[in-house]
Design a protein with these regions (language model features):
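Short, ordered loop/turn segments at secondary-structure junctions
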Residues: 70-73, 133
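Residue-level detector of anion-binding/catalytic polar loops
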Residues: 64-65, 127
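Conserved phosphate-binding and hydrolysis motifs of nucleotide-dependent enzymes
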Residues: 48, 70, 141
């Protein structure tokens, strides 16, 4: 498959945000144990939902496979580009967007590291229970694998703490599911 690099550069503009061919670091092509291998044609670092949407729209229209990636701990092999295409690295989308203490919710981007989220809420006297073995994993990765860890028996797993998501579908459509609304008990 031949990617239109000029189209990708219009979507993912800026220094050190789009890599192709031999410029893609080798750690992006296999799992952490070196058992699963793949090969992508491009590696993109979006900074916004709009860029993710535009990139997925391009990939959908041109039938290019996309492999999303968070922190890349890759302990389950899910971020290896087995079908080639584009690696969509969300690690630079790593901000807290909102903390709502009334609803006890925090809205973060998918690349936020678990250890950073835990430190953020703990500094405010709050607690985020899911605690998988890899502290440098991303929240997006935790959601995609429903990570739990040693606290799961007492507190549950990641899905138990997700109230809503902003998702970008494979065709680039942006969708809001759930939310942080509190519903009174009657």
């Amino acid at each position: 498959m031949a990617l239109d690099l000029s189209a990708l550069r219009r979507i993912i503009a800026g220094e050190n945000r789009l890599f192709t061919g031999a410029d893609i670091p080798v750690e992006y092509q296999s799992d952490v144990l070196g058992r699963v291998h793949g090969s992508a044609e491009a590696l993109a670092f979006p900074l916004s939902t709009e860029e993710v949407s535009a990139l997925l729209r391009y990939a959908h229209e041109h039938r290019v496979p996309v492999t999303p990636r968070g922190a890349g701990t890759n302990l389950v092999g899910s971020t290896v580009p087995l079908e080639g295409g584009i690696i969509l690295d969300l690690s630079r989308m790593d901000r807290v967007l909102e903390l709502d203490e009334d609803t006890m919710t925090v809205t973060v981007e998918p690349g936020m590291l678990l250890q950073d989220l835990q430190a953020y809420v703990e500094a405010r006297g709050l607690f985020y229970p899911p605690d998988p073995g890899e502290k440098a994993s991303s929240i997006g990765g935790n959601i995609s694998t429903n990570a739990g860890g040693m606290r799961a028996v007492k507190y549950g797993v990641t899905r138990d703490y997700v109230r809503g998501l902003e998702v970008v579908l494979a065709d680039g459509t942006v969708m809001q599911v759930g939310g942080n609304e509190l519903h009174p008990i009657c």
